[in-house]
Amino acid sequence: MNSMEIRQAFAGLLTLSMFIMLGNMIKKDHFDYPAEEVEIQTTEVSQHDLATVSHISQKSKQNDKALKPCWNPPTLKEVEQSKGFIIFSLTNGPEYHIAQVADAVVVAKYLGATLVLPDIKNSKSGNSMNLGDIYDVENVLNKLNGLVKVTKTLPPHVSTRNTPIVRVPNKVSQDYIMKKLKPIYQAKGIIKIESYFPSKNTISRNNNSLESLLCQTMFGGTLELKKEIQEEAESIVQKLETWSQESNGPFVAVDLRIEGLKNECNGKDGKGRKQCYQGHEIGEFLKRIGFGQETVIYVTQTKWSPDLNSLRYMFPKTYTKENIMSSTKKEKFINSESIEFEKAIDFYICSESDVFVPSILGPFYENVAGMRIVSGKNEIIVPSEVVSPSASASEHMSPYVTKKNHLAYKCFC
């Protein structure tokens, strides 16, 4: 290498060194912040905080948790099929409907009668609606096929005039049917039954065959919503799930109807415990057991009420059907003369949510709990007045789940 080439190589090396030094100076002046300025901000999380809602903040693997039917096919001693009929109506809202169907199936099966598909009594007007206005009639027929003889309507020659009306307790027993219903049925050939719901009732008095029939009717998918209502309910659930995923938390359904609380809330029970909770009380409870303000909450109240403002203040992502439905769907399902449409949608949403919280303990809570238990959605939280500073959501799980004292556990295992 001659002297000229050496000088050129040295000059190039010097230039490269200058660029490196300049780069380091720029980096130091503009990008190397003091350590305290770039330290990641962290929030101390206690073991208690982690124990509150972490187990329900992610989608549970519901297929893994779902129970399996453990009833055997009904083996009632074959009852001679008679020429008589059992008629009934669905009343008081969807939370009662499947239990009413199950009672009617058990009665018809035991008496050897033909079951006539029911109408639906409008809770507002008392007028009759067709079963197909809310439910999939063909599905009902398919599910009951083989369990009991069913007809859509009474034959023209059969009159319902002077039909005896007999009240039967929900989860009616074989003994009750034999003593109270059978003599009337044999004399008249037709009975209209009306289910009533005792405050305490079990199916322990029934034989295994009647229990199996009851289980299969209640939890075998007998009552499914008609397609249009089902699709709307699914659409709402999908929206709420999407919003909850964006918030990285659970989607909580709260059964809270302002009018219902005013009409049904009886203050405290015999032991001095609250029987119902207002919106602000639900909000405070959820905060204390660890739910963050980004939690997505669905409330069964149809239209927004000022009574819910405090709940939304604590949980801004609180919605009602009115906030979610399109104007067309609102006109059809909310502004109609029948509350049955919206209550059917509420029942579905509360059965499918990540977490269910009842503001009042009653049939809606009991039957939603049953649907959730059999599908493995055990996150049912019951509010409480007294919440300790170290309380967690798991401490307030429904006794239906913790004590396994729901009918569903007699039917599934």
Curated annotation (Swiss-Prot):
Highly and specifically expressed in the endosperm. The keyword Nucleotide-binding does not apply. Residues 27-413 are lumenal. The chain crosses the membrane at residues 6-26. GO terms for cellular component: Golgi apparatus; Golgi membrane. Residues 1-5 are cytoplasmic. Keywords: Carbohydrate metabolism, Cell wall biogenesis/degradation, Fucose metabolism, Glycoprotein, Glycosyltransferase, Golgi apparatus, Membrane, Signal-anchor, Transferase, Transmembrane, Transmembrane helix. Glycans are attached at N207. Substrate binds at D255, L256, R257. GO terms for molecular function: glycosyltransferase activity. Its EC number is 2.4.1.-. It is an enzyme of class 2 (transferase). Pathway: Glycan biosynthesis. It is a single-pass type II membrane protein. GO terms for biological process: cell wall organization; fucose metabolic process. It comes from the Eukaryota. It holds the Pfam family O-FucT. It is found in: Golgi apparatus membrane. Glycosyltransferase involved in mannan biosynthesis. Belongs to the glycosyltransferase GT106 family. This is Protein MANNAN SYNTHESIS-RELATED. It comes from Trigonella foenum-graecum. The gene is MSR.
